[in-house]
Structures are given as C-alpha cells and as structure tokens.
Amino acid sequence: MNKICLLLCCLLPGLFRAGAQELKMTEYAPLTQIYGEVCESDELLPMGDVGVEFGYVLYQAAITVPAGEAALELENVRDYAAVYLDGVFQGALTDNRKTLTLKAEPGRHTLQLYVENIGRITYGPEILDNSKGLFGEARLGGETIAGWTITPLEVRDTDPETLEFEALGPCNTPCFRRGQFDRAAHEGAVYLDVSGWGMGEVWINGHYLGSFWDEEKQQSILIPAEILA
C-alpha cells in the first residue's frame, strides 16, 4: 500500500474528498507558524505597503458589535476576503460584494480578514490603480474601524517539512491540514477533486501543486505521476 501525503492550506471551510476515495485529514498546523513581520496601522493598508505583492495577508482589529444587526462595510477589497469573528467564519467579500452583516452578541470581538490577491489587472481603467488587499474606509454600523494589525502570510513560500503538526481537532479558522490517501487505489491519471473545498493551496508529498477556489470553473487538479512514486 502506497500512502501519499496531502497538505492543504485552507482559507475557507470545506468538505474534503478525492474522487471515490475519502481523504483522511488527520493533522493540522496553525497559520501563526508562517506569520511575516506584523505592521500596526490606524487605517487599512494595501498589500504593497507591507511588502506583499502576491499571496495572502491577515487584517485584524478589535471591534465593538452593537445590539442588533451590524453591517461590516469595506471600501476596497482586492480581491477576496474571508471574514471571521472570534475565529468563526462569517462570510466572504469581494470588490463586487463589500458589505456583510456580522452575527455576534453585543460587545468586544476580534475581527479577522484573510485576504488573497488573485491576480493583477492588465487592461482597462483599473490598471492605473492596481493596489491589492484592503484599503480605504472600513466601517461597522457606520462607525470607522481603526487600530489594525496587518500580517503577511507566507503560504506559498512555506517548506512543508518545517511545519509542526498536531492531531486535528475542531479547527474553524484557516490552517494547514495534512492527511493521506492510497495511491494503489487509483490506476492511470490521478486527479484531486477540490469541489466544495472553499479556497486554499495544495501540496502532495512536499510538492506544491497550486491553488483552488470553489468559484472557479476548474474543480480538479492533476497530480503528476512522478510525485506519486
């Protein structure tokens, strides 16, 4: 039996499977292990201002949620933001969908925005402003949110061998997940079915295969035969 090591970095929650064979995700590693240099700012800063051209950045702030519903409004989202409140997923925002109602008890909470730069604009009027990340105003219930902690997440530069894993328990926030599947159960080309996985990155046997996102048309990743040997 040839067991293959699968590593995921998941920014959005999802269900895990590999075609007809169930994936066994048994371990996790928190993203704190790949934090870059933290920047503190009263206002949101684009990724370029914290030294990130591509990839992911975590924006965090302490907020006070009023009684009743409170709408989170972001002026610019480039390109995708997974919104968490005290580690609980609230929803996702894009530059076409920049308002989200938060669900929480009144009081102090930690707002976490995991943001990915999906790519650069190469045509049209927005080419003059190719900033990525979050920038401009951020409001909760009409009130400006200040006091941001901005942290680069060095996901794609990670050497999987350097991560420290522990047994997988309840893990609601983005993290690395590691598991195995049986190569002997598949003949011919092997594809990883990523439909329903949310958003993240994939490594097999230490080899980086690429990213996935459930809003893209392609929902499978070909696993090269040479890394399954």
What does each of the following model-derived ranges do?
Residues 69-84, 111, 181-205, 212-213:
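Aromatic-lined ligand-binding clefts that engage carbohydrates, nucleic acids, or primary amines
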Residues 100-108, 182-183, 220-229:
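Short, surface-exposed tryptophan/glycine-enriched loops
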Residues 19-128, 160-163:
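Carbohydrate-binding surfaces of carbohydrate-active enzymes
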Residues 4-13:
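Sec-dependent N-terminal signal peptides
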Residues 141-182:
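Compositionally biased low-complexity segments at domain edges in trafficked proteins
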Residues 116-146:
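Glycine/proline-rich low-complexity spacer/linker segments in large multi-domain proteins
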Residues 59-61, 98-100, 177-179, 217-221:
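Short strand-edge motifs at loop-to-beta-strand transitions and within beta-strands
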Residues 90-91, 145, 209-210:
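Short, isolated positions in well-ordered beta-strands
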